[in-house]
Amino acid sequence: MKTISIYTDGACSGNPGPGGWGAVLFHGDRVKEIYGGEPDTTNQRMEIKAVIEALKALKVSGWDVTVFSDSAYVVNAFNQHWIENWQRNGWRNSKKDAVANQDLWRELVHLTGLNRVRLEKVKGHAGNEWNERCDQLARQGIRELNGEG
């Protein structure tokens, strides 16, 4: 079976404010780094966006993909079946409010359907080499938005 591991992270300078996302993708001995940013966003949106952009970068389907994220928001949405509940409830949360970041969640649902994707929580800012690298990439996305390249 073809397997890929992905580390992701999002960051925001102010919340809301300029934000960035970063991801590192591993397949065998190949490593690919990607990042980007948005001028007016939130940290949570950037955490989701990092996973979306990483899955878009795969350009494959039917693979086993493990995504490592330090975002409890993203990991719990999948592993605690929040997304399934939101969909069943017409994209409303348990308080009957519209789900925040619905546009990104819908895109992520589509992309996760192309491969066998599982999410695992990693502790942020705890010395995990690849989580730290994703944080650096996300902050680079913010710097480039601010013209600091």
Model-derived features: where do they sit?
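A short, polar/acidic, helix/strand-boundary loop motif
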Residues: 29-46
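RNase H catalytic domain
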Residues: 8-18, 52-133, 137, 141-142, ...
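Short beta-strand scaffold segments in enzyme catalytic cores
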Residues: 21-25
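Extreme N-terminal starter segment of soluble prokaryotic enzymes
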Residues: 1-5
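Short amphipathic alpha-helical face segments that pack within enzyme cores
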Residues: 45, 49-53
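Generic beta-structure capping elements
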Residues: 26-28, 70
